[in-house]
């Protein structure tokens, strides 16, 4: 809500920085809470991811609506009020949960449940190398696709910014549901072939994207975004399987530090590639990136028996 009181760009930048600082708690703490005490974490993480991606998909539409109806300040006031109310509700929820558990903290109640078995150091190092490498490359792919897709549609279709926004909303909304499918698969089958298949599908569809135009662009975009969004829960499931609960928040924090660092660097990269060669070259680079993820998943072969429950 502080951002709604800003009167110049410096104040807005300061307010947005504070929003980022406090919102940063979500991934390290929120994801650790989602997987706490669970044997099968794919579906819970997928549901969490769907809500997150739907939030991203709706953000532009709702923000535009609030700005049109009440001005730009309302775009900060309304989310601020909702966040405060949710925080108050969560505090009441925590208190009632502790009372029902006899006053014991939630961590004490769930301690020892669904903890991963001891993992050899070499195996752990291999798995985390794969996690962080695929996180970095996957973050580049995710940011590149979500950031560039509206511009791709504006070049392929004639229409207002609102129409282009609806095209993007359609793609992101449908694609977010892929996480549920992948979440179910990783809960019931080996992660390695699923991860490899998702990466290979991305590479193939990115290559196809360089060859299509018109309405086919929308169809292929939905297809490759299904694969891009489908990858989201896989790394989080791997972290939950190999890291004990007391270290899980730190592991998620490092993973998302890598993700957001790469995502920030993706924006100037997209601008440079598009300005120099166009989107065809960008999708060629994304196809190569997805192929590198596929190669990385092959290194899970010797460790997967250990990380599976």
Language-model-detected regions and their locations in the chain:
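Interfacial helix-cap and linker-helix signal at transmembrane-aqueous boundaries
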Residues: 65-70, 153-154, 185-186, 270-277
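A late C-terminal transmembrane helix in Major Facilitator Superfamily
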Residues: 242-277
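Flexible cytoplasmic inter-helical loops of multi-pass small-molecule transporters
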Residues: 92-117, 306-309
């Amino acid at each position: 809500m502080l951002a709604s009181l800003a009167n110049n760009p410096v104040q807005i930048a300061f307010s947005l920085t504070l929003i980022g600082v406090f919102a940063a708690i979500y991934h390290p703490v929120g994801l650790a809470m989602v997987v706490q005490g669970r044997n099968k974490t794919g579906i819970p993480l997928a549901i969490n991811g769907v809500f997150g991606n739907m939030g991203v998909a709706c953000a532009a539409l709702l923000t535009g609506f609030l700005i049109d109806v009440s001005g730009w300040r309302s775009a900060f006031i309304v989310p601020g009020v909702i966040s405060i109310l949710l925080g108050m509700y969560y505090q009441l929820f925590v208190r009632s949960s502790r009372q029902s558990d006899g006053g014991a903290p939630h961590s004490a109640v769930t301690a020892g449940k669904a903890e991963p078995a001891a993992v050899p150091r070499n195996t752990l190092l291999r798995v985390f190398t794969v996690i962080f490498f695929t996180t970095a490359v996957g973050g580049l792919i995710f940011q590149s696709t979500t950031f560039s897709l509206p511009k791709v549609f504006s070049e392929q279709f004639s229409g207002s910014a609102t129409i282009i926004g609806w095209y993007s909303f359609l793609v992101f909304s449908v694609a977010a549901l892929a996480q549920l499918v992948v979440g179910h698969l990783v809960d019931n089958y080996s992660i390695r072939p699923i991860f490899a298949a998702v990466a290979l599908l991305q590479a193939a569809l990115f290559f196809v994207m360089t060859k299509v135009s018109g309405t086919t662009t929308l169809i292929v975009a939905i297809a490759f975004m299904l694969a891009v969004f489908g990858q989201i829960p896989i790394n989080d499931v791997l972290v939950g399987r190999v890291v004990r609960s007391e270290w899980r928040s730190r592991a998620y924090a490092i993973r998302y530090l890598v993700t957001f660092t790469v995502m920030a660097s993706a924006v100037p990269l997209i601008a440079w590639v598009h300005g120099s060669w166009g989107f065809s070259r960008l999708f060629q680079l994304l196809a190569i990136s997805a192929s590198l993820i596929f190669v990385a998943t092959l290194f899970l072969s010797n460790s997967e028996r250990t990380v599976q429950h």
